[in-house]
Amino acid sequence: QYTVIDDAIDNTLDNGRGGLGTIVVFSAGNGNGAVSYPANSDPRIIVVGAMSPCGERKNPSSCDGESWGSDFGAELDVMAPGVKVPTTDRQGSAGYHSSDYTQTFNGTSSACPHVAGLAGVILDLNPCLGHEQVAEIIAESAQKVGSYTYSFTSGYPYGHWNNEMGYGLIDIDRAMEMTKVLKYQSQGFY
């Protein structure tokens, strides 16, 4: 069903950043099943799943001993670390305190900021890229990790893909290198 949320996503993808399109990144979800709304509402959204520390899709039987699982399926684009991610936690009292940090940020909500940050790095290197180009760089630079079979799949234009892992684990170094090469080529520096 078409909603205000869908309209906002569509508008930002089409018109954000002066017409280049805003990079929209959503968490896949933590139900160990199919990606759900709103992450599955537009194929231009970059959908992020969570990896376990053992290089596999986070699932209830993965090595970390936690009982949740990253959602997966047709809409999944890439994976990022999603178990016990260190981060700040500024919900407590005013000012800095030792409890302002956590070592246990979990779920696809902890994986998603890795990809949003990678998109920011890509745009810092080349702010003229459209949202499709950023998504392509993120997908094509991803590492094929784990014992999964990645294959060319109809409807997945950025290379080898897997139903549980998408295009694989994000790789900031490869993404930065691809962005630099693309920038130099577009400026005529072959």
Model segments located where?
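Extracytoplasmic/secreted envelope proteins and their assembly/folding machinery
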Residues: 6-10, 45, 66, 112-119, ...
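Catalytic-core environment of secreted peptidases
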Residues: 53-110, 146
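C-terminal subdomain of the subtilisin-like protease fold in secreted/lumenal serine endopeptidases
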Residues: 21-22, 37, 44-47, 124-190
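Acidic glycine-/aspartate-rich tracts in secreted/extracellular proteins
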Residues: 31-32, 52-55, 83-84, 123-128, ...
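Structural recognition of the beta-strand scaffold that forms the well-ordered cores
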Residues: 22-27, 46-49, 77-80, 86-87, ...
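Substrate-binding/access-modulating region of protease and related hydrolase catalytic domains
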Residues: 1-44, 92-113, 125-128, 140, ...
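A generic structural signal for nonpolar/aromatic side chains embedded in well-ordered alpha-helices
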Residues: 12, 69, 78, 138, ...
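Hydrophobic aliphatic residues
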Residues: 28, 42, 49-52, 73, ...
